[in-house]
Curated annotation (Swiss-Prot):
Bilayer disposition of the protein: Single-pass membrane protein
Designated name of the protein: Putative uncharacterized protein DDB_G0287263
A cellular component annotation (GO) from this entry: membrane
Keywords: Membrane, Transmembrane, Transmembrane helix
Compartment list: Membrane
Main location: membrane
Residues passing through the membrane, by range: 50-70
Length: 70
């Protein structure tokens, strides 16, 4: 049970940090006219998509490990 709570808090921290970074990136695009070129926003979108996939994979691995533990 302690492992479950610990892994849930880790996933929560990762997701919150990711969302915070994404919000910061979006604000930078809106504020800076120079950085908001089509190439820049495309690159940021690709990196955020990769981050989403990584977070989902990590959450899935933790979930499978929790099921094995039970």
């Amino acid at each position: 049970m302690e492992l479950l709570n610990k892994s849930i808090s880790v996933v929560k921290n990762v997701v919150c940090n990711f969302l915070f970074e994404k919000i910061k990136i979006d604000e930078n695009i809106n504020i800076d006219g120079i950085d908001s070129g089509p190439g820049m926003s495309k690159r940021l979108t690709t990196s955020t998509n990769i981050n989403v996939v990584l977070v989902l994979i990590i959450a899935l691995i933790i979930f499978i490990l929790m099921l094995d533990g039970v």
